[in-house]
UniProtKB/Swiss-Prot annotation:
The primary product of this enzyme is 4,2',4',6'-tetrahydroxychalcone (also termed naringenin-chalcone or chalcone) which can under specific conditions spontaneously isomerize into naringenin. It catalyses: (E)-4-coumaroyl-CoA + 3 malonyl-CoA + 3 H(+) = 2',4,4',6'-tetrahydroxychalcone + 3 CO2 + 4 CoA. Pathway: Secondary metabolite biosynthesis; flavonoid biosynthesis. SUPFAM superfamilies: Thiolase-like. InterPro entries: Chalcone/stilbene_synt_C, Chalcone/stilbene_synt_N, Chalcone/stilbene_synthase_AS, Polyketide_synthase_type-III, Thiolase-like. Pfam families: Chal_sti_synt_C (PF02797), Chal_sti_synt_N (PF00195). PANTHER family: CHALCONE SYNTHASE, HYDROXYMETHYLGLUTARYL-COA SYNTHASE. Disulfide bonds: none annotated. It comes from Sorghum bicolor. The keyword Transferase applies. This is Chalcone synthase 5. It comes from the Eukaryota. Its EC number is 2.3.1.74.
C-alpha cells in the first residue's frame, strides 16, 4: 500500500482561501401587494372584523403613526384573508392554511431575489458551491433550500444549509456562516437567501396582548440574496463589502425579551417593552469587542447597517453611542419603505447603502467610509455583530441592473 504523499496540514492549507469573504452581488424582491401604513389601521380592523374595538383601534393607529414606516409589502391579500377567517382571529386554529402559503411562497420569493443577485454576479450558476437559506416561517421537508435548488437549476451536489425559526437577528447569522464557508473552502461561491413572509404571524387584535399588535404594525414581507466568496476574480467579479469578522452573543438579563412560539394558531410573537433599552445598554460593549482590535473608537467614522426592529431601538442606539443622524440613513430608509422584514432587512440595507453611495458620488460602497458594522437583533435576546470593510467605487459599480 502506497503511503500518502501529503500531510493533513497540507490538505487543510490547500482547502482554505487566501483572502477574506466578500459580498459579490445583492438582489432583493417583495410581493406585488403594497400596503400603505396610513391606511393600514382601517384595513386591519375591518378585515379582522374588529371595528367595534374603537379604543384598541386608536392605540393601533398611534403605533402605526410612530412606526416611521411609510409602506410595506405583504403576500396576504384581502381576498385570501376573507377566505380564511381563522387567520383573522387572535387565537384560532389556522396553521394548515398558513403553511399552505409559506411552503410555496417563501422559496418562490427567495428565487426572485436570488435571480437578481446571480444576474448581477454575472457568473454561471454552476459555480455556486453552497446555498444557505433562512426563513422564520414554513418548516417543511425537504425544505425551502431544496425547493430553491430545484427552482434555480443549481447543481444537485450544491452544499445546502437550511435555517428555520431564527428571527430578526439572522441576517447577521447567514453572513457569519457564509464567511466561514467561503474562507474555509477555496473557490467556494455561497448563495445566501433570506425570505420572509408574515402569513405565519398575521392575526387579529387582542386587548390583553398589545405586544402582538406591535408586530402587526411593523412586519412586512421581503426576500434578499447575496453571493459571497473569497479571493474574487476582479476581471469578472465586483466586490462590494468584505466580511472581516463576525460574532454572536446573548445579552445579559434578556431572557424572554423577544419570543416566538409556533402553535396551531400560527407563530405567536411576544415582546417586552424594554427591548430598546436592553439593546442600547449593551451596544457599546459589542462595538468595543468588534472594533478595539482595529483601533476604532469613533463610531461616527464607520458606516452602519442595523436591523430596524423598530424606531425606538434605532433612536436609543443613536443616543447611547452619540451617532449623527446620517449614520442610520440607509437603515431608516429600509424601515420606511419596507417595514421590518426580519432576517432580510440588513441585506436590503446593504443594497440601499451601496446604491446610494454610488449615486451620491461617494468614494466607497460604505458611504465613503472604509469600515462599518452590521447588527442583527432578535429572539434571545441575541445580537449578531459583523465588521465590514467597504471597497472603492468605480464608474458604474455598486449599482445593479
Amino acid at each position: 500500500m502506497a503511503a500518502a504523499t501529503v500531510t493533513v496540514e497540507e490538505v487543510r492549507k490547500a482547502q482554505r482561501a487566501t483572502g477574506p469573504a466578500t459580498v459579490l452581488a445583492i438582489g432583493t424582491a417583495t410581493p406585488a401587494n403594497c400596503v400603505h401604513q396610513a391606511d393600514y389601521p382601517d384595513y386591519y380592523f375591518r378585515i379582522t372584523k374588529s371595528e367595534h374595538m374603537t379604543e384598541l383601534k386608536e392605540k393601533f393607529k398611534r403605533m402605526c403613526d410612530k412606526s416611521q414606516i411609510r409602506k410595506r409589502y405583504m403576500h396576504l391579500t384581502e381576498e385570501y384573508l376573507a377566505e380564511n377567517p381563522n387567520m383573522c382571529a387572535y387565537m384560532a386554529p389556522s396553521l394548515d392554511a398558513r403553511q399552505d402559503i409559506v411552503v410555496v411562497e417563501v422559496p418562490k420569493l427567495g428565487k426572485a431575489a436570488a435571480h437578481k443577485a446571480i444576474k448581477e454576479w454575472g457568473q454561471p450558476k454552476s459555480k455556486i458551491t453552497h446555498l444557505v437559506f433562512c426563513t422564520t416561517s414554513g418548516v417543511d421537508m425537504p425544505g425551502a433550500d431544496y425547493q430553491l435548488t430545484k427552482m434555480l437549476g443549481l447543481r444537485p451536489s450544491v452544499n445546502r444549509l437550511m435555517m428555520y425559526q431564527q428571527g430578526c437577528f439572522a441576517g447577521g447569522t447567514v453572513l457569519r456562516v457564509a464567511k466561514d464557508l467561503a474562507e474555509n473552502n477555496r473557490g467556494a461561491r455561497v448563495l445566501v437567501v433570506c425570505s420572509e413572509i408574515t402569513a405565519v404571524t398575521f392575526r387579529g387584535p387582542s386587548e390583553s396582548h398589545l405586544d402582538s399588535m406591535v408586530g402587526q404594525a411593523l412586519f412586512g414581507d421581503g426576500a434578499a440574496a447575496v453571493i459571497v466568496g473569497a479571493d474574487p476574480d476582479e476581471r469578472v467579479e465586483r466586490p462590494l463589502f468584505q466580511l472581516v469578522s463576525a460574532s454572536q452573543t446573548i445579552l445579559p438579563d434578556s431572557e424572554g425579551a423577544i419570543d416566538g412560539h409556533l402553535r396551531e394558531v400560527g407563530l405567536t410573537f411576544h415582546l417586552l417593552k424594554d427591548v430598546p433599552g436592553l439593546i442600547s445598554k449593551n451596544i457599546e460593549r459589542s462595538l468595543e469587542e468588534a472594533f478595539k482590535p482595529l483601533g476604532i473608537t469613533d463610531y461616527n467614522s464607520i458606516f452602519w447597517v442595523a436591523h430596524p426592529g423598530g424606531p425606538a431601538i434605532l433612536d436609543q442606539v443613536e443616543a447611547k453611542v452619540g451617532l449623527e443622524k446620517e449614520r442610520m440613513r440607509a437603515t431608516r430608509h429600509v424601515l420606511s419603505e419596507y417595514g421590518n422584514m426580519s432576517s432580510a432587512c440588513v441585506l436590503f440595507i446593504l443594497d440601499e447603502m451601496r446604491k446610494r453611495s454610488a449615486e451620491d458620488g461617494q468614494a466607497t460602497t460604505g458611504e465613503g467610509f472604509d469600515w462599518g458594522v452590521l447588527f442583527g437583533f432578535g429572539p434571545g435576546l441575541t445580537v449578531e455583530t459583523v465588521v465590514l470593510h467597504s471597497v472603492p467605487i468605480t464608474t458604474g459599480a455598486a449599482i445593479t441592473a
